[in-house]
Amino acid sequence: MSLGAKSRKLFFLAVNTGFVERGLPDRRCRDFYAERSRSGLYCAIVGNVVIPGGVGSNDACAEISSSDAWRQLAEGISEQGTLPGIQLTTAWRGYRGMKRFISVAGAHVPQEYRQVPASMSPLDVKTTFDALYRGSELAFQAGFRHLQLHAAHGYLFSLLVDRRLSPHSDLAADLVRRWVHDVASWGGESSLRFSLWTGHPSIDKHGQSQFIEIIVSLPVDYLDVSAGFYNVDKRLIYPTLPDVLSSRRTGTLDLARRYPHIQFIMSGKSSGAWDPSLPANVHVGICRDLIANPNFLRDRDQGCNDCMKCHYFSRGQSYLTCGRWTYPRVLPFPVKQA
């Protein structure tokens, strides 16, 4: 299986599995990541982990802490020869993720996205980043060596760094730079996930180029390119339709060619985009195909079939499932509550 440039890396991208018990990753979570952290995978990023004192996007989010459960999770990944990664995030008090795939709230959605940062003082912003710094220290102490800031999908960090939405974007960008410096000083890698567009025209049609300029100025090791805000249009976050997939890939590749000195992670069923002609600064992020099949890197014919069962929150469930998991050879561990 040729992936083009020898330096191209494969990432298992962040997903909120819901495999959580009392706010901590449970045995299902450990098994899930250990099963997928092999066969040449460079880094597995444990997804949607809430910073200390933060707010989860739903009730099935784990919060980083000094618990030994985090060390066990990181060890389970590293023992398979893969770099343990973790994605840190927070929403805000009163946040509710929508269960529909497309918002019917119209103009009210961007109003909320502007009101939340506007209601925060500079001290509030610094306090939020202090929690990120503390959470990053805890994650590194647990053994995670790749730390990702979740600044996408309409969660709090994505609002704070966006000048179109936040009066604190310059401050937030400076605080991200401090975070990158801290992670590098420990010997870790950093990445930032961001949304190329939100999916709401009243936001996307103004200031897009200035937003991108801020993002590419952040000195993270990798920029993980996503799209969409969760409470606007989830189809952009989880692209399935050919035109949406094409737009996501085209947008990522355009960025990579404009900024050849920056390392990008291409996501959005990007396992189907493996191509020796990809720019050398584009790495492959895989999510749904590896969710469906832990052995996907060895058996690429058995990946995601778009059954949509992984969208557990939208389906009113509390943890991740997959239609392919009915085959024991694909999922050799139980998915029932531990």
Label the model's feature ranges.
Residues 1-338:
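Flavin-dependent oxidoreductase catalytic cores
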